[in-house]
Swiss-Prot record:
This is Serine--tRNA ligase, cytoplasmic. Belongs to the class-II aminoacyl-tRNA synthetase family. Type-1 seryl-tRNA synthetase subfamily. The lineage of its organism: Eukaryota, Fungi, Dikarya, Ascomycota, Taphrinomycotina. Pfam families: Seryl_tRNA_N, tRNA-synt_2b. Keywords: Aminoacyl-tRNA synthetase, ATP-binding, Cytoplasm, Ligase, Nucleotide-binding, Protein biosynthesis.
Length: 450
């Protein structure tokens, strides 16, 4: 969440910066003034509580003097009891007001970076650059959709998957399994060579931890809840969630020596993905459970934009190594999630659909997450009014099922699928996977793309 001091002019803040950021997001601007008013009410309660504590101390001293002089202190004792009761009520009010205020602050998005294109329409996402392998024709005629290629490889079984697991359930089979595992292992090796620490994350988080790292609407729209007696846990939607909390409550006193910390997170991810998504619902492109390799970096605040560039470059190098055509797009302000100050997506080319689809999201969340999780940096100084928090950044490297879909469409031949060169060592040296099944009569490509 944002720094509460940013709302207070008298503390060096500038609430107009927050208002302008809210306008860019298409979000409520009036909430800024609501926080300012709530802060004043909270300060008033704190002031009253401090005065009550002073009164209690004064009365306590007077009682001591009366007792020492063996005089009647009954009236003072009654006053003390009354003040103590008042203190209790004020503490309850102050705690409730602070919680209410922080809940409102938490609903306000991060400050949108100046370089983000301002729009409420994702059609206005800005194309930063494109890349395609030299000598490769991006357009393919008479090709199959990724789910048809996987069917012909006998690489997955959606019918039995739905039978045992429900909507969008699937079994990966044979080369589907080996392709997926190859992407996982290659992704981890790729990041390990670039200084990342591999981290296999837990797939369930306690409710209080998830509340610090996920947006409120994610609880309703995206996350699966697991209830065990009185305990509530949530299945993770991305390893970013547990890894962001990995260093919660920690303080890096020597950031120049201790930061950055770079993690290659690996986990199965779970998303409810409510509703239909048209072509995205084909095959294993958009499913409820999938594997993902995630980049997560904690850095000194002054170096986070340098890290942002490095992370999107890593993602580009990964897909260049797979020789998949892609483009980088800057996401418009109105489509940013609350934590992100700026986001780039890498969209790869799917020839059957004839369009680019998102494979990577790379975000700089600045100190929005670390403030919630109390991950600080810098030398500890007595009386510091301004806390310094690390900056947190996240980027997909490879959501393996989705990346596999892209590989299948781009590497298909009339007789099977070529294996990308960088994956061949992870596929037992195989360079080509032959088709072993025919398509059903009502398959997608036989119906036409519409």
């Amino acid at each position: 969440m944002l720094d509460i001091n940013l709302f207070q002019v008298e503390k060096g803040g500038n609430p107009e910066i927050i208002r302008e950021s809210q306008r860019k997001r298409g979000a409520d601007v009036g909430v800024v003034d609501k926080v300012i008013e709530m802060y004043k009410e909270w300060v008033s309660l704190r002031f009253e509580l401090d005065n009550t504590n002073k009164s209690i101390n004064r009365v306590q001293k007077e009682i001591g003097l009366k007792m020492k002089a063996k005089e009647d202190a009954s009236e003072l004792l009654e006053e003390k009891n009354s003040l103590t009761e008042r203190k209790k009520n004020l503490i309850e009010q102050e705690t409730a007001k602070n919680k209410e205020m922080l809940n409102v602050v938490s609903s306000i998005g991060n400050i949108v970076h100046d370089s983000v294109p301002v729009s409420m329409d994702e059609d206005n996402n800005e194309i930063i650059r494109k890349w395609a392998p030299e000598g490769v024709t991006v357009e393919k005629k008479n090709c199959l959709s990724h789910h048809e290629v996987l069917t012909r490889l006998d690489g997955y079984d959606p019918e039995r998957g739905v039978k045992v697991s429900g909507h969008r359930g699937y079994f990966l089979r044979q080369y589907g399994v080996f392709f997926n595992l190859a992407l996982i292992q290659y992704g981890l090796d790729f990041l390990e060579k670039r200084g990342y620490i591999a981290l296999q994350a837990p797939t369930m988080l306690n409710k209080d931890v998830m509340a610090k790292t996920a947006q409120l609407e994610q609880f309703d729209e995206e996350l699966y809840k697991v209830i065990d007696g009185d305990e509530e846990r949530y299945l993770i939607a991305t390893s970013e969630q547990p890894i962001s909390a990995y260093h919660s409550g920690e303080w890096f006193e020597k950031p120049s020596e201790q930061l950055p910390l770079k993690y290659a997170g690996y986990s199965t991810c779970y998303r409810r993905e409510a509703g239909s998504h048209g072509r995205d619902a084909w095959g294993i492109f958009r499913v409820h459970a999938f594997e993902k390799i995630e980049q997560f970096v904690l850095t000194d605040p002054e170096k986070s934009w340098e890290a942002f560039t490095e992370m999107i470059n890593h993602a580009e190098d990964f897909y260049k190594s797979l020789e998949l055509p892609y483009r980088i797009v800057a996401i418009v302000s109105g489509a940013l999630n609350n934590a992100a100050a700026k986001k780039y997506d890498l969209e790869a080319w799917f020839p059957f659909q004839g369009e680019y689809k998102e494979l990577v999201s790379c975000s700089n969340c600045t100190d929005y997450q670390s403030r919630n999780l109390e991950i600080r940096c810098g030398v500890k100084k007595m009386g510091d009014r301004e806390k310094k928090y690390v900056h947190c950044l996240n980027s997909t490297l490879c959501a393996t099922e989705r990346a596999l879909c892209c590989i299948l469409e781009n590497y298909q031949t009339p007789d099977g699928v070529n294996v990308p060169k960088v994956l061949q060592p992870y596929m037992g040296g195989k360079t080509f996977l032959p088709f072993t099944k025919e398509l059903p009569k009502n398959s997608t490509s036989k119906k036409g793309k519409n």
